[in-house]
Amino acid sequence: MNAHQIFVQDVTLRDGMHAVRHRIGLDDVRRIVAALDAAGVDAIEVAHGDGLAGSSVNYGPGSHTDWEWIEAAADVLERARLTTLLLPGVGTIHELKTAYDLGVRSVRVATHCTEADISAQHITAAREIGMDVSGFLMLSHMAPPAELAKQALLMESYGAHCVYVTDSGGRLTMNDVRDRVAAYRDVLDPATEIGIHAHENLSLSVANSVVAVETGAVRVDASLAGHGAGAGNCPIEAFVAVANLSGFEHGCDLFALQDAADDLVRPLQDRPVRVDRETLTLGYAGVYSSFLRHAERAADQYGVDVRELLMECGRRGLVGGQEDMIIDIALDQVGAVAS
Protein backbone atom coordinates (compact mmCIF):
# COMPACT_ATOMS: atom_id res chain seq x y z
CA MET A 1 0.00 0.00 0.00
CA ASN A 2 1.22 3.52 -0.70
CA ALA A 3 1.52 6.22 1.95
CA HIS A 4 -2.09 7.35 1.62
CA GLN A 5 -3.94 4.10 0.88
CA ILE A 6 -5.76 2.94 3.99
CA PHE A 7 -7.51 -0.18 5.22
CA VAL A 8 -10.71 0.76 7.06
CA GLN A 9 -11.87 -1.71 9.69
CA ASP A 10 -15.27 -1.27 11.30
CA VAL A 11 -15.64 -2.18 14.99
CA THR A 12 -19.33 -1.31 15.51
CA LEU A 13 -20.18 -4.94 16.28
CA ARG A 14 -17.27 -5.58 18.64
CA ASP A 15 -16.16 -2.45 20.50
CA GLY A 16 -19.69 -1.15 20.00
CA MET A 17 -20.97 -4.05 22.08
CA HIS A 18 -19.75 -2.17 25.18
CA ALA A 19 -22.11 0.70 24.37
CA VAL A 20 -25.15 -1.59 24.49
CA ARG A 21 -23.90 -3.85 27.30
CA HIS A 22 -23.17 -6.64 24.78
CA ARG A 23 -26.84 -6.91 23.89
CA ILE A 24 -27.83 -6.79 20.23
CA GLY A 25 -30.23 -8.86 18.16
CA LEU A 26 -29.21 -11.01 15.23
CA ASP A 27 -31.39 -9.11 12.77
CA ASP A 28 -29.64 -5.88 13.79
CA VAL A 29 -26.29 -7.57 13.22
CA ARG A 30 -27.35 -8.62 9.73
CA ARG A 31 -28.63 -5.15 8.84
CA ILE A 32 -25.48 -3.43 10.07
CA VAL A 33 -23.11 -5.88 8.37
CA ALA A 34 -24.98 -5.66 5.08
CA ALA A 35 -24.87 -1.86 5.21
CA LEU A 36 -21.16 -1.77 6.04
CA ASP A 37 -20.36 -4.29 3.33
CA ALA A 38 -22.29 -2.28 0.74
CA ALA A 39 -20.59 0.93 1.93
CA GLY A 40 -17.17 -0.47 1.08
CA VAL A 41 -15.39 -0.99 4.40
CA ASP A 42 -12.46 -3.39 4.20
CA ALA A 43 -13.15 -5.45 7.31
CA ILE A 44 -15.92 -5.92 9.86
CA GLU A 45 -15.14 -7.10 13.39
CA VAL A 46 -17.73 -9.18 15.24
CA ALA A 47 -17.54 -10.51 18.82
CA HIS A 48 -18.45 -9.78 22.41
CA GLY A 49 -16.93 -6.44 23.39
CA ASP A 50 -14.14 -8.24 25.23
CA GLY A 51 -13.50 -10.64 22.40
CA LEU A 52 -14.24 -14.30 21.84
CA ALA A 53 -15.56 -15.97 25.02
CA GLY A 54 -15.81 -12.56 26.72
CA SER A 55 -19.38 -13.17 27.85
CA SER A 56 -19.04 -13.53 31.63
CA VAL A 57 -20.10 -12.11 34.98
CA ASN A 58 -16.96 -9.96 35.13
CA TYR A 59 -17.11 -8.48 31.63
CA GLY A 60 -20.87 -8.69 31.15
CA PRO A 61 -23.01 -11.45 29.62
CA GLY A 62 -23.90 -11.23 25.95
CA SER A 63 -27.43 -11.49 24.64
CA HIS A 64 -26.18 -14.09 22.14
CA THR A 65 -23.10 -16.22 21.73
CA ASP A 66 -20.16 -15.08 19.64
CA TRP A 67 -21.01 -17.88 17.22
CA GLU A 68 -24.57 -16.65 16.71
CA TRP A 69 -23.36 -13.12 16.02
CA ILE A 70 -20.61 -14.32 13.67
CA GLU A 71 -22.96 -16.64 11.79
CA ALA A 72 -25.45 -13.78 11.36
CA ALA A 73 -22.69 -11.59 9.94
CA ALA A 74 -21.40 -14.31 7.64
CA ASP A 75 -24.94 -14.88 6.31
CA VAL A 76 -25.00 -11.47 4.59
CA LEU A 77 -21.33 -10.68 4.03
CA GLU A 78 -20.34 -10.60 0.37
CA ARG A 79 -17.10 -8.67 0.13
CA ALA A 80 -15.52 -7.36 3.35
CA ARG A 81 -13.16 -9.43 5.51
CA LEU A 82 -14.86 -10.96 8.56
CA THR A 83 -12.73 -10.26 11.61
CA THR A 84 -12.79 -10.93 15.34
CA LEU A 85 -10.87 -10.13 18.52
CA LEU A 86 -9.25 -12.49 21.01
CA LEU A 87 -7.70 -11.79 24.40
CA PRO A 88 -5.34 -14.61 25.47
CA GLY A 89 -6.61 -15.96 28.77
CA VAL A 90 -10.20 -15.14 27.84
CA GLY A 91 -10.47 -16.71 24.40
CA THR A 92 -8.57 -19.87 23.50
CA ILE A 93 -7.11 -21.40 20.36
CA HIS A 94 -10.17 -23.66 20.25
CA GLU A 95 -12.41 -20.58 19.98
CA LEU A 96 -10.10 -19.16 17.34
CA LYS A 97 -10.47 -22.28 15.22
CA THR A 98 -14.24 -22.30 15.67
CA ALA A 99 -14.39 -18.69 14.47
CA TYR A 100 -12.33 -19.65 11.42
CA ASP A 101 -14.74 -22.51 10.65
CA LEU A 102 -17.60 -19.98 10.72
CA GLY A 103 -15.92 -17.74 8.17
CA VAL A 104 -13.66 -15.42 10.18
CA ARG A 105 -10.46 -14.80 8.24
CA SER A 106 -8.75 -12.13 10.34
CA VAL A 107 -8.11 -11.81 14.07
CA ARG A 108 -6.66 -9.20 16.37
CA VAL A 109 -4.84 -10.75 19.33
CA ALA A 110 -5.03 -8.26 22.18
CA THR A 111 -2.84 -7.91 25.26
CA HIS A 112 -2.01 -5.18 27.72
CA CYS A 113 0.62 -2.92 26.19
CA THR A 114 3.48 -4.42 28.23
CA GLU A 115 2.45 -8.07 27.91
CA ALA A 116 2.96 -8.92 24.24
CA ASP A 117 4.71 -12.15 25.21
CA ILE A 118 1.41 -13.80 26.16
CA SER A 119 0.19 -13.45 22.56
CA ALA A 120 2.79 -15.80 21.06
CA GLN A 121 0.72 -19.00 21.02
CA HIS A 122 -2.40 -17.36 19.66
CA ILE A 123 -0.67 -15.35 16.94
CA THR A 124 1.27 -18.44 15.85
CA ALA A 125 -1.88 -20.59 15.82
CA ALA A 126 -3.79 -18.00 13.79
CA ARG A 127 -1.00 -17.86 11.22
CA GLU A 128 -0.90 -21.66 11.02
CA ILE A 129 -4.58 -21.88 10.06
CA GLY A 130 -4.14 -19.19 7.43
CA MET A 131 -5.59 -16.10 9.10
CA ASP A 132 -4.60 -12.48 8.71
CA VAL A 133 -3.29 -11.55 12.18
CA SER A 134 -2.83 -8.25 13.97
CA GLY A 135 -1.32 -7.58 17.36
CA PHE A 136 -3.38 -5.23 19.52
CA LEU A 137 -1.45 -3.47 22.30
CA MET A 138 -4.18 -2.15 24.58
CA LEU A 139 -3.92 0.97 26.75
CA SER A 140 -0.99 2.10 24.62
CA HIS A 141 -0.72 5.34 26.61
CA MET A 142 0.65 3.35 29.56
CA ALA A 143 3.97 2.57 27.83
CA PRO A 144 6.40 5.14 26.40
CA PRO A 145 6.97 4.95 22.63
CA ALA A 146 10.26 3.04 22.73
CA GLU A 147 8.91 0.41 25.13
CA LEU A 148 5.69 0.06 23.16
CA ALA A 149 7.71 -0.44 19.98
CA LYS A 150 9.65 -3.28 21.65
CA GLN A 151 6.33 -4.95 22.43
CA ALA A 152 5.21 -4.45 18.82
CA LEU A 153 8.44 -6.07 17.67
CA LEU A 154 7.64 -9.13 19.78
CA MET A 155 4.22 -9.46 18.16
CA GLU A 156 5.82 -9.13 14.74
CA SER A 157 8.30 -11.88 15.66
CA TYR A 158 5.39 -14.20 16.50
CA GLY A 159 3.93 -13.65 13.03
CA ALA A 160 1.66 -10.59 13.23
CA HIS A 161 1.05 -8.96 9.84
CA CYS A 162 0.12 -5.70 11.58
CA VAL A 163 0.49 -4.18 15.04
CA TYR A 164 -1.84 -1.53 16.45
CA VAL A 165 -1.37 1.49 18.62
CA THR A 166 -4.50 0.84 20.68
CA ASP A 167 -5.72 3.85 22.63
CA SER A 168 -8.18 1.94 24.80
CA GLY A 169 -8.49 4.82 27.26
CA GLY A 170 -8.80 7.58 24.69
CA ARG A 171 -5.87 9.19 26.51
CA LEU A 172 -3.39 9.79 23.67
CA THR A 173 -2.87 13.25 22.22
CA MET A 174 -1.85 13.79 18.60
CA ASN A 175 1.81 14.07 19.57
CA ASP A 176 1.52 10.86 21.59
CA VAL A 177 0.11 9.02 18.57
CA ARG A 178 2.73 10.46 16.23
CA ASP A 179 5.55 9.39 18.54
CA ARG A 180 4.24 5.84 18.95
CA VAL A 181 3.56 5.21 15.27
CA ALA A 182 7.00 6.60 14.40
CA ALA A 183 8.59 4.35 17.03
CA TYR A 184 6.86 1.33 15.49
CA ARG A 185 8.01 2.29 12.02
CA ASP A 186 11.59 2.65 13.22
CA VAL A 187 11.80 -0.97 14.41
CA LEU A 188 9.24 -3.01 12.45
CA ASP A 189 9.88 -4.64 9.10
CA PRO A 190 8.65 -2.38 6.28
CA ALA A 191 6.24 -5.16 5.26
CA THR A 192 4.57 -5.14 8.69
CA GLU A 193 1.61 -2.79 8.74
CA ILE A 194 0.73 -0.41 11.56
CA GLY A 195 -2.80 0.18 12.79
CA ILE A 196 -4.52 2.83 14.89
CA HIS A 197 -7.45 2.22 17.25
CA ALA A 198 -8.68 5.51 18.69
CA HIS A 199 -11.35 6.50 21.20
CA GLU A 200 -13.22 9.79 21.39
CA ASN A 201 -12.90 10.47 25.13
CA LEU A 202 -10.78 13.61 24.58
CA SER A 203 -12.52 14.42 21.26
CA LEU A 204 -9.34 13.46 19.37
CA SER A 205 -10.27 10.18 17.67
CA VAL A 206 -10.47 11.52 14.11
CA ALA A 207 -7.45 13.78 14.55
CA ASN A 208 -5.42 10.97 16.10
CA SER A 209 -6.36 8.59 13.29
CA VAL A 210 -5.36 11.14 10.65
CA VAL A 211 -2.02 11.80 12.38
CA ALA A 212 -1.41 8.05 12.56
CA VAL A 213 -1.97 7.66 8.82
CA GLU A 214 0.25 10.64 8.06
CA THR A 215 2.99 9.03 10.19
CA GLY A 216 2.74 5.62 8.52
CA ALA A 217 -0.31 3.73 9.77
CA VAL A 218 -2.34 1.83 7.17
CA ARG A 219 -5.15 0.18 9.12
CA VAL A 220 -7.70 2.45 10.79
CA ASP A 221 -10.37 1.30 13.23
CA ALA A 222 -13.65 3.21 13.23
CA SER A 223 -17.33 2.60 13.90
CA LEU A 224 -20.72 3.83 12.79
CA ALA A 225 -21.68 6.90 14.84
CA GLY A 226 -18.55 6.22 16.88
CA HIS A 227 -20.44 3.32 18.49
CA GLY A 228 -18.05 1.95 21.10
CA ALA A 229 -16.86 2.01 24.69
CA GLY A 230 -16.66 5.28 26.58
CA ALA A 231 -17.26 8.26 24.29
CA GLY A 232 -16.97 5.79 21.45
CA ASN A 233 -14.49 4.95 18.74
CA CYS A 234 -13.42 7.08 15.83
CA PRO A 235 -16.73 7.78 14.00
CA ILE A 236 -16.29 6.15 10.62
CA GLU A 237 -18.43 8.65 8.72
CA ALA A 238 -16.47 11.63 10.10
CA PHE A 239 -13.14 9.93 9.49
CA VAL A 240 -14.04 9.05 5.90
CA ALA A 241 -15.06 12.66 5.27
CA VAL A 242 -11.69 13.88 6.53
CA ALA A 243 -9.92 11.11 4.61
CA ASN A 244 -11.57 12.39 1.43
CA LEU A 245 -10.44 15.93 2.17
CA SER A 246 -6.93 14.69 3.00
CA GLY A 247 -6.50 12.67 -0.17
CA PHE A 248 -6.34 9.25 1.51
CA GLU A 249 -7.28 6.40 -0.81
CA HIS A 250 -10.05 4.07 0.37
CA GLY A 251 -13.16 2.37 -0.94
CA CYS A 252 -15.82 3.73 1.42
CA ASP A 253 -19.04 5.50 0.47
CA LEU A 254 -19.47 8.48 2.81
CA PHE A 255 -23.22 8.95 2.41
CA ALA A 256 -23.93 5.23 2.83
CA LEU A 257 -21.97 5.24 6.09
CA GLN A 258 -23.85 8.32 7.30
CA ASP A 259 -27.16 6.60 6.60
CA ALA A 260 -26.12 3.42 8.42
CA ALA A 261 -24.89 5.43 11.42
CA ASP A 262 -28.06 7.46 11.83
CA ASP A 263 -30.66 4.93 10.71
CA LEU A 264 -29.28 1.66 12.11
CA VAL A 265 -26.92 2.36 15.00
CA ARG A 266 -27.98 5.47 16.92
CA PRO A 267 -31.45 4.00 17.64
CA LEU A 268 -29.77 1.07 19.45
CA GLN A 269 -28.02 3.23 22.04
CA ASP A 270 -29.63 3.25 25.49
CA ARG A 271 -26.97 5.74 26.64
CA PRO A 272 -25.73 8.39 24.19
CA VAL A 273 -22.24 7.61 22.92
CA ARG A 274 -20.66 11.04 23.24
CA VAL A 275 -18.15 13.17 25.10
CA ASP A 276 -19.75 14.15 28.42
CA ARG A 277 -18.49 14.61 31.97
CA GLU A 278 -18.16 10.88 32.56
CA THR A 279 -16.54 9.87 29.27
CA LEU A 280 -14.25 12.91 29.22
CA THR A 281 -13.05 11.81 32.66
CA LEU A 282 -12.20 8.39 31.22
CA GLY A 283 -9.80 10.00 28.77
CA TYR A 284 -8.45 12.50 31.28
CA ALA A 285 -7.72 9.72 33.78
CA GLY A 286 -6.49 7.27 31.15
CA VAL A 287 -8.97 4.58 32.15
CA TYR A 288 -10.02 1.66 29.96
CA SER A 289 -13.07 2.91 28.04
CA SER A 290 -15.15 -0.20 28.72
CA PHE A 291 -15.06 0.63 32.45
CA LEU A 292 -17.71 3.33 31.86
CA ARG A 293 -20.86 1.28 32.30
CA HIS A 294 -19.37 -0.68 35.22
CA ALA A 295 -18.36 2.56 36.96
CA GLU A 296 -21.74 4.19 36.38
CA ARG A 297 -23.51 1.20 37.95
CA ALA A 298 -21.18 1.19 40.95
CA ALA A 299 -21.49 4.95 41.44
CA ASP A 300 -25.27 4.72 41.36
CA GLN A 301 -25.34 1.75 43.73
CA TYR A 302 -23.02 3.26 46.34
CA GLY A 303 -23.80 6.96 45.93
CA VAL A 304 -20.36 8.17 44.85
CA ASP A 305 -19.33 10.54 42.05
CA VAL A 306 -18.53 8.45 38.98
CA ARG A 307 -15.79 10.93 38.05
CA GLU A 308 -13.99 10.46 41.36
CA LEU A 309 -14.37 6.72 40.91
CA LEU A 310 -12.82 6.85 37.44
CA MET A 311 -9.99 9.14 38.57
CA GLU A 312 -9.08 6.64 41.28
CA CYS A 313 -9.14 3.82 38.71
CA GLY A 314 -6.61 5.86 36.76
CA ARG A 315 -4.44 6.56 39.81
CA ARG A 316 -4.34 2.84 40.57
CA GLY A 317 -3.48 1.99 36.97
CA LEU A 318 -6.29 -0.52 36.52
CA VAL A 319 -6.23 -2.44 33.25
CA GLY A 320 -8.71 -4.52 31.28
CA GLY A 321 -9.91 -7.49 33.29
CA GLN A 322 -9.94 -5.61 36.60
CA GLU A 323 -13.54 -4.43 36.31
CA ASP A 324 -14.33 -6.09 39.65
CA MET A 325 -11.98 -3.63 41.38
CA ILE A 326 -14.34 -0.77 40.58
CA ILE A 327 -16.72 -1.88 43.33
CA ASP A 328 -13.82 -2.13 45.80
CA ILE A 329 -12.85 1.46 45.00
CA ALA A 330 -16.45 2.62 45.41
CA LEU A 331 -16.63 0.94 48.83
CA ASP A 332 -13.33 2.57 49.83
CA GLN A 333 -14.76 5.96 48.87
CA VAL A 334 -17.95 5.34 50.83
CA GLY A 335 -15.85 4.34 53.84
CA ALA A 336 -13.68 7.45 53.53
CA VAL A 337 -16.76 9.67 53.57
CA ALA A 338 -18.26 7.81 56.54
CA SER A 339 -15.08 8.17 58.58
From Swiss-Prot:
It is an enzyme of class 4 (lyase). It comes from the Bacteria. Keywords: Aromatic hydrocarbons catabolism, Lyase, Manganese, Metal-binding. SUPFAM superfamilies: Aldolase, post-HMGL domain-like. It catalyses: (S)-4-hydroxy-2-oxopentanoate = acetaldehyde + pyruvate. Residues 6-258 form the Pyruvate carboxyltransferase domain. Belongs to the 4-hydroxy-2-oxovalerate aldolase family. HAMAP family: HOA. This is 4-hydroxy-2-oxovalerate aldolase 1. The lineage of its organism: Bacteria, Bacillati, Actinomycetota, Actinomycetes, Propionibacteriales.
